[in-house]
Design a protein with these regions (language model features):
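Phosphate/dinucleotide-binding and metal-coordinating scaffold of catalytic cores
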Residues: 2-287, 291-293, 303-308
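Canonical protein kinase catalytic loop motif
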Residues: 298
Length: 308
């Protein structure tokens, strides 16, 4: 546990020490990694792991993130995937000065089952959020109206809010029935209302599977909330990861417009991974977008569920 001891000692420059750890899918090791913990994001000061070397464990290759599709560039792909999986550097609700309340980050999530293991004694069953819950201090801080007086703010690494990506302010909360909800706040107040209206209309249309949103009040703000659709046996794979994991064919590359290329390659990627009903889902989603006048459709705000 050399890294843990080093990371916990205050006053030392722990960020320069090479550490060795394993990317896990539940209790399956999928990649051996070496690298450093760095404050790698431009605007927010979130320590993240950046790999210098990544080695795929062949016997568990099928459990890798879909995004990591090539052994030749596995280190580059891991770092890109990892950066997409955590807080966006465009988030405006992240405190400028932080006092971390726990030892080191495993980067568990409520949308997949990947995590960083530092020691072979660490077990998925003891640490994952689905079974063990999580502290709410990190999410409380993101939504507080008093960030300027939090100097420093106290946050936990071991929180699903650290791996809630995207630009909107968001947090996870678990109710008394142990059901997890994602709560989102928008800067202009319009987005959360749009999500609730879209839920009403899509329910009436009944043509495509969708995530239902409702309104709630969180820390004096009108927010939208949705139930977690990922379970202990599934993970969410963004369409962008499926899209980027398949090489472009010459035929698609020669299409005239970018929307044509994007659509054609996405459908080709869905067929490559043999996603049941995937192409039909995309077509119906695009029809619903036209009805809703949704011009914000992109490959990171929809996706597919994978059994794990």
């Amino acid at each position: 546990m050399y890294f843990v001891e080093r990371f916990c000692k205050k006053g030392e420059n722990d960020l320069e020490n090479t550490i060795y750890l394993t990317l896990m899918n539940k209790d399956r090791p999928v990649m051996n990694l070496s690298g450093k913990i760095k404050e790698d994001l431009k605007r927010i000061k979130l320590p993240v792991f950046v790999a210098d070397k990544a080695e795929i464990i062949e016997e568990n290759k099928k459990f890798l993130p879909v995004f990591i599709h090539s052994a030749e560039i596995s280190t580059e792909l891991f770092n890109k995937w990892f950066a997409k999986r955590i807080l966006s550097d465009k988030r405006r609700d992240f405190p400028s000065k932080i006092e971390w309340q726990d030892e080191f980050p495993h980067f568990f999530s409520l949308t997949d089952h990947y995590w960083l293991r530092y020691d072979e004694t660490e077990k998925y069953s003891d640490l994952n959020f689905f079974d063990n819950g999580y502290k709410t201090l990190t999410g409380d801080t993101f939504f507080t109206k008093n960030i300027p007086v939090l100097n420093p703010a106290q946050l936990y690494f071991h929180s699903p809010d650290i791996t809630a990506n995207g630009n909107m302010s968001k947090r996870w909360k678990r109710n008394d029935n142990k059901i997890d909800y994602l709560i989102k706040r928008s800067g202009n107040k319009q987005e959360v209302l749009n999500e609730v209206f879209a839920t009403w209309l899509l329910n009436k249309l009944n043509i495509v599977t969708f995530v239902a949103y409702s309104l709630c009040i969180e820390k004096y703000d009108i927010c939208s909330m949705c139930r977690n659709f990922v379970t202990k046996d599934t993970e969410f794979v963004p369409a962008a990861h499926v899209y980027e994991a398949v090489p472009f064919s010459d035929e698609i590359r020669d299409l005239k417009t970018n929307p044509e290329r994007t659509y054609a390659h996405l459908i080709e990627s869905i067929k490559y991974f043999n996603i049941p009903g995937g192409a039909e889902f995309v077509d119906k989603m695009l029809i619903a977008d036209e009805i809703l006048m949704n011009d914000d459709r992109h490959l990171n705000n929809f996706g597919f569920l994978r059994d794990v």
